[in-house]
Amino acid sequence: MTSTQRLWSGALPLLTALIVSIAATASLAGPRARDLGVPFEGTPGALNAITDVAGVEVGHTTVISGDGAMVIGKGPYRTGVTIIHPLGKTSLDGVAAGRAVINGTGEWTGMHLVDEVGQFLGPIALTGTGNVGLVHQSMMDWSVGKVPEEALFSRLLPVVAETLDNRLNDVFGHGLTRDHVFAALDGAKGGPVAEGNVGGGTGMIAYTFKGGIGTSSRVVSAGDTRYTVGVLVQANHGDRNDLRIAGVQIGKEIKGAWPEVNGIVAAGPDAGKPQDKNSLLIVIATDAPLMPHQLERMARRAALGVGRNGSTAGALSGEFALAFSTSHVIPLGGKPRLPAIINDTDSETMNALFRGVVQATEEALVNQLVASETMTGANNAKVYGIPHDQLARIMKARFPRR
């Protein structure tokens, strides 16, 4: 075990949270898609993040340790967990929710409850496939002492979603610990959200480039009323040959930056074939007072935002969307609080919200590409971040007046 591994596995939650906070701050320093000249439609919130929806908090734990050949149980590890508290970490209440399955080859726990009663209680966790069980149990453990004992049953079905980080990470080695999960749960906060190689997105690959966590938001208007729609994605999907940014076939125009193993560009019978697999998670938050079936409609529109960037939801790419409303609160042990109801036939409002989901999903996916940096992981596999200089040059040539 390396010194780095000992640090991660043996650290107290407070120390782990400090390390995670430092890493997250560093990842906020880089450019976002708009900084490279990528044009987007719609009006973002002040942060252009899911945390523009009041009350939403996000936390990450990032685990990076070891190099070279993979030895199961010893690494290298490139994994983590991302936590979203819909109403903040101190709230005991739930929220109305709806979800959509774009392609079902993956796992998102707690979704049968969402389908049946249109709500969930507690945080959302995004992580790597091999961590689902550990994260699920850790979230239950974290609730003990925070939720009254007579109401602990409300935390029996944690909401945990996964994408497969096996290219860069020892997925069977279980590099994530209970303390890591607690650190993300306790360290979640509002404000700017770290993107790229952080949290659950640490070991992910998107469109054959390095992928990870991305976020965006839109402020939409219907008459005199304004609502905010925020989106956070964990991207591990897509094929470079399909990638479009602002309608431009970026994946085909960018030169080089193909994945390598031991310094050699990947080759063999699968080289050049579509690689759209391994999954995509989309979390949608809004302050619009929506019913569960309306939130399901919102979740379905996320697929249109994904399609704008060229993904076809490959046969083995588990792609899911979950939408919730911070205005439709389910008090623990009480009656739901809903300040108003938006009629399903109110096309002006619903269409504005749908448009916000599509636009924010599209931008969140580009933001995660821009934020994700080149990474070398298990078995010396190296995946490149999308080259900023090439992307900026292409955008400037196509959109010179922006």
Curated annotation (Swiss-Prot):
Keywords: Aminopeptidase, Hydrolase, Periplasm, Protease, Signal. Pfam families: Peptidase_S58. Inhibited by AEBSF (4-(2-aminoethyl)benzenesulfonyl fluoride, Pefabloc SC), ampicillin and AMP(hyd) (ampillicin-derived penicilloic acid). GO terms for biological process: proteolysis. One of its GO terms (cellular component) is periplasmic space. Transmembrane segments: none annotated. It catalyses: Cleaves N-terminal beta-homoamino acids from peptides composed of 2 to 6 amino acids. Its EC number is 3.4.11.25. It comes from the Bacteria. It is found in: Periplasm. It is an enzyme of class 3 (hydrolase). PANTHER family: BLR5678 PROTEIN, D-AMINOPEPTIDASE. Heterooctamer of 4 heterodimers ((alpha:beta)4); each heterodimer is composed of an alpha subunit and a beta subunit processed from the same precursor. Beta-aminopeptidase that can cleave synthetic beta-peptides which consist of backbone-elongated beta-amino acid residues that are not processed by common proteolytic enzymes. Can cleave the beta-peptides beta-homoVal-beta-homoAla-beta-homoLeu and beta-homoAla-beta-homoLeu. Belongs to the peptidase S58 family. This is Beta-peptidyl aminopeptidase BapA. It comes from Sphingosinicella xenopeptidilytica. The gene is bapA.
